[in-house]
Amino acid sequence: MKKNLGLILMSVLALSCFVSCNSKKAKKDAGELVVYGSCEEEYLAAACAKFESLTGVRTTFQRLSTGEVLTKIEEEKGNPSADVWFGGTTDPYNEAAAKGLLLPVEPKNASHLVGKQFKDANNNWFGIYRGILGFFWNTEELQRLKLEPPKDWDDLLKPEYKGLVSFANPNTAGTGKLIVNTMVQLKGEKAAMDYFAKLDKNICQYTKSGSGPSKLVPTGEIVIGIGFLHDVVYQIVNNGYTNIGMTSPSSGTSYEIGATAIFKGAKNLDNAKKFIEFALSPDCVNLAQDNGSYQFLVIDNAKPVEVAIKNGLDKIETMVYNFDDAKTNGPKYYAEFFEVISKDDRVKTK
């Protein structure tokens, strides 16, 4: 009896070792994936951790603004150090696609996108969320200064706002590029550049990242910001700030499409394709609102973003944004923008 029990025990141990060893081998065989992420880091980290837990693929990431990613992959052309780009506005993605830096793919989950505008016509990138551009301000500071909050774009030109306004540097942030393109589409190219030349007099800082102003407004370092309203909701809901007001411009505003794509020359291509499928699934996009990212989702099987709805973002109407014009002429507009503003230490790159 003891002999039989010993044999059984040895068999169980051998089987356990076999399963364990093969499990480790399978995990090793799953390989790795490197992600450049331009969404907020909480969501980026959660998405990469979830992908790794679902697939066994060892996933590492680096958080960079879209402008930084674009610069980096241009320098690495043909030999990228990352496989996938996750999050951030599509204007820089379009620049990357035009330079042949992205790999077209056809993920099955793209069938769940709620509109054709949420993917590149040539399958270079795919949308994962939508964010609305607007204004926000420190209510305590405006009260102290005895100033009314801005209601429309031209209000930002008021001389009493001198040194109070901020938005993102178009060289480092897709948000800045979107603001430039939005004004061109609302006012026309020349009028938009005249507008930015005047607005520059009121700018205290062009931040490195798109979410920068939303982080600095509640602390009083900046009084009025231009950026995405979901970033403001984060400051209210997650950080508990009660001194922030926000609105959308009365004459019209635009929106970002946050995207994901594979870099041409990706070293872990099969895993990169798996990640794109994952990025277009509820497993990924539903993590956003659980990690402080309150953009509207653009796949038909995702959960509604209740926090954004409670804060009224679903009631904001947006303009028909011309993505083709931004894609074709954006680089020219950005160059013109930097010609009309004062290039000094207010333009942040770090």
Predicted regions and their residues:
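Mature extracytoplasmic/periplasmic domains
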Residues: 258, 263-320
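Short beta-strand-to-loop elements that line the ligand-binding cleft
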Residues: 59-65, 86-87, 203-209, 246-248
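Conserved C-terminal helix/tail region of periplasmic/extracytoplasmic solute-binding proteins
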Residues: 318-350
